[in-house]
């Protein structure tokens, strides 16, 4: 009744799904707990471990062609291996909602967060703590042209798991602190490359290689050899210091929303990242919309490192926790996934945002709060 009253209609994604989309787009924490087997036709299939991917595939297969925004909700069983304990089950009921095709991303993000917040309040839960983040903050820094391509690829692979990204940055800081600088004049070409923006180094080295003569290249072009040599050199070298510092600082932000956004702007200014500054400025509208939709921004914390362990998120993410300090305090979570529909069979990217919650965990909290 709650979802219908907000304009969301029911969908029923299948329980049995192809395993590949889940293996490709979920984080290791969920992938390692999936129930996967091979059907008689030789296809790898699974019991759905969550509902967003099946709903996105359903939308791509049969609803997208209708055009326009589409709001839907679901309630159904999902399956993840676990050692049964309080708040953790191998089969549990997941309820949630997805909003596909909303042209105004900020408005759609806040609509879905407010929908989740209101749903939990409708159950009788009042001590709710909202945390938000934005995966795009990190993507903006990784796209910076000062970052060497080899490091861009390496950090992009690590970024969905922020603990892994943190380790990469810590190891880089240790290398920079313990590795002496190369003696001046050690390599004229190396010095020249150091003074050249990362985006222009391929062309510079390829020009140098063309003076050697094609008989030394075999079947590869000077450009291919240049890229390979640069990848090796960049992988051994440090991360661009301004970007490394900005990434490390972002991972440390855990502040009330207004203070957190001010901190992100400061990080952007220090790093000289116009892209990150623009993203932080774009959050001002979300803050205003939160207040309009009944979620007090003063009670929201900004935690950019909150990727939720799921790899399909592309921007805004959020979690709502109860007031306990337990490991199972999270009641629901969600976020934006603008490229998921295309990756599961859609003909083009579709802006989308949604959330889900485990009903058993909510019922457990309600029982604990009952007089």
What is each residue range found by the language model?
Residues 2-6, 17-20, 52-65, 69-126, ...:
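Positively charged, Gly/Ser-enriched RNA/tRNA-binding surfaces
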Residues 11, 15-45, 88:
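Polyanion/phosphate-binding surface patch
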Residues 13-15, 129-136:
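Acidic carboxylate-rich catalytic motifs and surrounding loops in phosphoryl-/glycosyl-chemistry enzymes
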Residues 19-20, 136-137, 158:
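Short secondary-structure capping/turn micro-motifs that flank functional sites
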Residues 25-29, 144-146, 316-318:
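Short low-complexity, flexible loop/linker segments enriched in glycine and/or proline
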Residues 33-41, 146-181, 322-324:
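Acidic, His- and aromatic-enriched active-site or binding-groove loops in soluble protein domains
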Residues 91-96, 132-140:
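Short, conserved phosphate-binding/catalytic loop or strand-edge motifs used
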């Amino acid at each position: 009744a709650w979802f219908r009253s907000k304009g969301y209609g029911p969908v029923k994604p299948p329980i049995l799904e192809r395993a590949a989309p889940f293996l490709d787009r979920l984080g290791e924490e969920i992938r390692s707990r999936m129930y996967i087997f091979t059907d008689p036709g030789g296809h790898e299939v699974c019991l759905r471990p969550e509902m967003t991917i099946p709903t996105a595939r359903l939308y791509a297969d049969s609803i997208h062609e209708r055009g326009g925004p589409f709001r839907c909700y679901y309630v159904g069983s999902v399956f993840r291996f676990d050692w049964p304990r309080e708040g953790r089950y191998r089969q549990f009921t997941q309820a949630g909602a997805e909003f596909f095709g909303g042209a105004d991303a900020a408005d759609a993000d806040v609509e879905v967060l407010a929908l989740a917040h209101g749903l939990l309040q409708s159950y009788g839960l009042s001590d709710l703590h909202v945390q938000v983040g934005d995966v795009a903050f990190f993507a903006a820094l990784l796209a910076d042209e000062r970052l060497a391509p080899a490091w861009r690829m390496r950090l992009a692979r690590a970024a969905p798991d922020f603990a892994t990204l943190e380790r990469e940055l810590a190891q880089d800081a240790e290398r920079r602190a313990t590795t002496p600088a190369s003696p001046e004049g050690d390599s004229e070409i190396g010095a020249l490359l150091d003074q050249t923006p990362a985006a222009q180094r391929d062309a510079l080295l390829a020009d140098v290689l063309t003076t050697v003569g094609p008989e030394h290249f075999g079947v590869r072009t000077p450009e291919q050899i240049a890229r390979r040599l640069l990848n090796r050199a960049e992988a051994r070298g440090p991360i661009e210091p301004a970007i490394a510092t900005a990434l490390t600082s972002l991972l440390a932000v855990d502040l009330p929303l207004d203070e957190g956004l001010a901190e992100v702007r400061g990080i952007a200014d220090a790093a000289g990242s116009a892209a990150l500054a623009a993203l932080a400025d774009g959050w001002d509208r979300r803050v205003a919309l939160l207040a309009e939709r009944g979620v007090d921004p003063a009670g929201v914390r900004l935690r950019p490192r909150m990727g939720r362990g799921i790899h399909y998120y592309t921007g805004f993410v959020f979690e709502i926790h109860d007031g306990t300090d337990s490991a199972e305090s999270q009641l629901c979570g969600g976020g934006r996934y603008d490229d998921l529909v295309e990756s599961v069979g859609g003909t083009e990217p579709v802006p989308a945002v949604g959330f889900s919650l485990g009903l058993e965990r909510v019922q457990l909290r309600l029982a604990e709060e009952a007089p």
